[in-house]
């Protein structure tokens, strides 16, 4: 039997002890930052019996993405969309790739007509980035608040009224050097919105491998481009094209055949035991690709 837990579960969940010495293979996931299996061995809070005697696999956020699917399914409901706007884009931290996308949308003339927000703006957040490959200046943007998530410390899954008035959701994921899909993408998919996800090259391909489907009228070729600056340009161009060629109701109608199926896919992928435990089998989609990339501490 294989059981999936988070690092936090390993440190704080006493139920783990009942599986000690039972022959379980542990799958330990971390979804926030990049670590390695050395992270566990260096952490003084991790029980030594676990490191020494158990068989475990460690995967960082490039591989353990079920967390955000689970959280989305539990917190988001399928919501009717009454489109007034072409798209909405909600940003928390103004990372350079997000600013570059916003700048280009503004230059192309569509940003001001659609709701967008920044919930944080600090020079250190903007300066710290692995996205220097953009090689372009980004204009500082003031805080613009549509929702109260960051202000009132409310749920990540609370959205402003403009969310349900927008035909498309632009999901600018936090990382561009790896495929890391969060609630930014999963939540609008779960709500029933056409979602254009932008992250590391292959993000949309990853979504398709998980069973999500999208209209053929949307050109996702940007997703295969490894050069970040070019990917930003192609993404902004495609968003602008859709906004020019379709009205908001037409975009909603375009996505209608996929709306319910994508929501059901999230629900299916989120079927887990309490406290993020999950029995894994070889039939779980995409087990093989990442199984070759992570190391085993075999008994």
Where do the language-model regions lie?
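Pol beta-like nucleotidyltransferase catalytic core
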Residues: 1-171, 178-299
């Amino acid at each position: 039997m294989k059981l999936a837990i988070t690092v936090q579960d390993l440190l704080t969940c006493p139920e783990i002890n009942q599986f000690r010495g039972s022959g379980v293979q542990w799958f330990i996931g971390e979804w926030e930052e990049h670590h390695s299996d050395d992270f566990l061995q260096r952490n003084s809070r991790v029980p030594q019996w676990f490191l020494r005697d158990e068989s475990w696999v460690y995967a960082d956020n490039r591989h353990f993405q079920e967390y955000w699917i689970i959280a989305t399914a539990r917190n988001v409901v399928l919501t009717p969309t009454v489109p007034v706007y072409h798209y909405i884009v909600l940003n928390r931290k103004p990372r350079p790739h997000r600013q570059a996308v916003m700048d280009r949308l503004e230059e192309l003339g569509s940003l001001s007509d659609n709701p967008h927000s920044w919930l944080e703006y600090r020079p250190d957040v903007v300066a710290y980035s692995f996205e220097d490959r953009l090689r372009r200046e980004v204009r500082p943007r003031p805080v613009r608040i549509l929702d109260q998530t960051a202000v009132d410390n409310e749920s990540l899954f609370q959205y402003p009224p403009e969310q349900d008035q927008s035909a498309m959701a632009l999901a600018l994921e936090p990382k561009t050097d790896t495929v890391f899909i969060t609630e930014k993408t999963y939540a609008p998919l779960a709500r029933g919105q056409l979602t254009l996800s932008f992250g590391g090259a292959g993000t949309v391909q990853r979504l398709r491998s998980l069973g999500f489907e999208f209209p053929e009228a949307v050109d996702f070729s940007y997703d295969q481009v490894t050069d970040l600056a070019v990917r930003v340009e192609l993404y902004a161009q495609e968003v602008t094209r859709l906004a020019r060629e379709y009205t908001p109701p037409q975009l909603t109608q375009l996505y209608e055949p996929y709306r319910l199926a994508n929501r059901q896919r999230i629900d299916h992928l989120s079927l887990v035991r309490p406290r993020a435990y999950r029995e894994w089998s070889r039939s779980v989609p995409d087990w093989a690709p990442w199984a070759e990339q992570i190391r085993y501490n075999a008994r």
